[in-house]
Swiss-Prot record:
A lipid is attached at residue 337 (S-palmitoyl cysteine). This is Potassium voltage-gated channel subfamily A member 5. It comes from Rattus norvegicus. Induction: Expression regulated by cAMP in a tissue-specific manner. In primary cardiac cells, levels increase by 6-fold, and in GH3 cells, levels decrease 5-6-fold. The keyword Nucleotide-binding does not apply. One of its GO terms (biological process) is atrial cardiac muscle cell action potential. GO terms for cellular component: cell surface; intercalated disc; intracellular canaliculus; membrane; membrane raft; perinuclear region of cytoplasm; plasma membrane; potassium channel complex. Residues 1-238, 337-347, 406-420, 513-602 are cytoplasmic. Keywords: Cell membrane, Ion channel, Ion transport, Isopeptide bond, Lipoprotein, Membrane, Palmitate, Phosphoprotein, Potassium, Potassium channel, Potassium transport, Transmembrane, Transmembrane helix, Transport, Ubl conjugation, Voltage-gated channel.
Length: 602
């Protein structure tokens, strides 16, 4: 059979002419045009394939043989409409540049490409897609799998509205914007399908208001890692929970002991232990050689029993036991921490040191006082007693150690940290109000001899109590002018305190919902992972790191290929989204996990 090409109207069509009894010719339209499928935009190999298939089809028809099933699905010759001539018949659309004859870089850069997204056609240039060669559309080898030689275009059965943002990513040089009519989970799925990369995904999360998940660093040494997980993360294992329970009990015992030892009955008993009564002195002997000896003997019982009686104090024993546990816990955590510098700068670890430090100072002071001649002068004793009281007060900070084991206290701390600006404004407004109204009430009550305000600084207390709407009543205005000032002070205090409160409450709700959503997401991820393992759907496409808890596992791997994405691997293992809005995150998680096997969501 002989195949020859004849020019059509556009100068690039072809006509088949067969020889012998199997000769076949191109189907001509009434106007004399060729009705064969357009081939001007195809490369040489595609043209040969199309012509060979068409000739085989006609030979089979002339020989009276039935057509094979695949051959029956080939498009029949038809006349091109005006739209087809403008769109599909355009020789510049959908050209596969990797199979064409060599062209200069300028013409290849401006060559047009036709992309069909579920029936909606987009047109762009090769140079636009080539800006990101590692993506699906930017890599000629990757996008070749989606090329349709019959329609001369790239076809993707994906979400149509999302492609506006994907194409804008190429046109703008890397700016990713989600269309308003596309949900977050659908657009995130499209980003992964078109393989825009992790950097584009991170920028998308930041633009949408998502927070980057904090990475928990772990020590490299296996033994240190296990110890760190046990003492730092109570939810990592059963032994970690046991250690956390013991730590909480010790903290509570220490706080209860700190409070009980101030009761009058216990305080009097401790004073008796510390300073036992001096036994009655015998009559003074006559002056002589034995006088100094008897004086020394009379002072002996007041010094010797002090040290053992102090160590025998039950509160001292309980306090020593608690401090031993706190010291052991702090040293173990310091030994196993991944970074000594970060450990030293952590506020919670500073609180641990502050909670332990007073005990050793108190112990050293007690031992110094028990030494012969350590009593010293009364002035030194009063000074050491004042210092001890301040140091012992620091022990109350041990209550903050509970925040390590309480999510609620952690949320409260993050709320206060995020609201420092609002709290500063609140204190500044209160300071202005206190100065203003204390001065006003002083001068309003100055002529009254029974006034409670002797000076402006003396009126500061009244202004603070009134602005905070506490009103103890120990200081109050008497005159009419003073009462008017007091009324204005109370109203100003209510308005001043009410202004920053909504912002603080909003921050608290934000951190609270973020924590609860994170727990739900981790539980959902763990449940879905268990289901996949039970059904045998886990493949070797991801590298898994073994650890004590699923929440501490990190998954990684290369970008998915288009086939694996079509099969619908779980997107939650590759994209951890944390939203400011609880509703957005719940909707995203539900949509992502409800049906991961679908290819498009219109």
């Amino acid at each position: 059979m002989e195949i020859s090409l004849v020019p059509l109207e556009n100068g690039s069509a072809m006509t088949l002419r067969g020889g012998g009894e199997a000769g076949a010719s191109c189907v001509q339209t009434p106007r004399g045009e060729c009705g064969c499928p357009p081939t001007s935009g195809l490369n040489n190999q595609s043209k040969e394939t199309l012509l060979r298939g068409r000739t085989t089809l006609e030979d089979a028809n002339q020989g009276g043989r039935p057509l094979p099933p695949m051959a029956q699905e080939l498009p029949q010759p038809r006349r091109l409409s005006a739209e087809d001539e403008e769109g599909e018949g355009d020789p510049g659309l959908g050209t596969v540049e990797e199979d064409q004859a060599p062209q200069d870089a300028g013409s290849l850069h401006h060559q047009r490409v036709l992309i069909n997204i579920s029936g909606l056609r987009f047109e762009t240039q090769l140079g636009t897609l080539a800006q990101f060669p590692n993506t699906l559309l930017g890599d000629p080898a990757k996008r070749l799998h989606y090329f349709d030689p019959l329609r001369n275009e790239y076809f993707f059965d994906r979400n149509r509205p999302s492609f506006d943002g994907i194409l804008y990513y190429y046109q703008s040089g890397g700016r990713l914007r989600r269309p308003v009519n596309v949900s977050l989970d659908v657009f995130a799925d499209e980003i992964r399908f078109y393989q825009l990369g992790d950097e584009a995904m991170e920028r998308f999360r930041e633009d949408e208001g998502f927070i980057k998940e904090e990475e928990k660093p772990l020590p490299r040494n296996e033994f240190q890692r296990q110890v760190w997980l046990i003492f730092e993360y109570p939810e990592s294992s059963g032994s970690a929970r046991a250690i956390a329970i013991v730590s909480v009990l010790v903290i509570l015992i220490s706080i209860i002991t700190f409070c009980l030892e101030t009761l009058p009955e216990f305080r009097d008993e401790r004073e008796l232990l510390r300073h036992p009564p001096v036994p009655p002195q015998p009559p003074a002997p006559a002056p002589g050689i034995n006088g100094s000896v008897s004086g020394a003997l009379s002072s002996g019982p007041t010094v010797a029993p002090l040290l053992p009686r102090t160590l025998a104090d039950p509160f001292f024993i309980v306090e020593t036991t608690c401090v031993i546990w706190f010291t052991f816990e702090l040293l173990v955590r310091f030994f196993a921490c991944p970074s000594k510098a970060e450990f030293s700068r952590n506020i919670m670890n500073i609180i641990d040191v502050v909670a332990i430090f007073p005990y050793f100072i108190t112990l050293g002071t007690e031992l110094a006082e028990q030494q012969p001649g350590g009593g010293g002068q009364n002035g030194q004793q009063a000074m050491s007693l004042a210092i001890l009281r301040v140091i012992r007060l620091v022990r109350v900070f041990r209550i903050f150690k509970l925040s390590r084991h309480s999510k609620g206290l952690q949320i409260l701390g993050k709320t206060l940290q995020a609201s420092m600006r609002e709290l500063g404004l609140l204190i500044f407004f209160l300071f202005i109000g206190v100065i203003l109204f204390s001065s006003a009430v002083y001068f309003a009550e100055a002529d009254n001899h029974g006034s409670h305000f002797s000076s402006i600084p003396d009126a500061f207390w009244w202004a603070v109590v009134t602005m905070t709407t506490v009103g103890y009543g120990d200081m109050r205005p008497i005159t009419v002018g003073g009462k008017i000032v007091g009324s204005l002070c109370a109203i100003a205090g209510v308005l001043t305190i009410a202004l920053p409160v909504p912002v603080i409450v909003s921050n608290f709700n934000y951190f609270y919902h973020r924590e609860t959503d994170h727990e739900e997401q981790a539980a959902l991820k763990e449940e879905q992972g268990n289901q996949r393992r039970e059904s045998g759907l886990d493949t070797g496409g991801q590298r898994k790191v073994s650890c004590s808890k699923a929440s501490f596992c990190k998954t990684g791997g290369s970008l998915e290929s288009s086939d694996s994405i079509r099969r619908g691997s779980c997107p939650l293992e590759k994209c951890h989204l944390k939203a400011k809005s609880n509703v957005d995150l719940r909707r995203s998680l539900y949509a992502l996990c409800l049906d991961t096997s679908r290819e498009t969501d219109l």
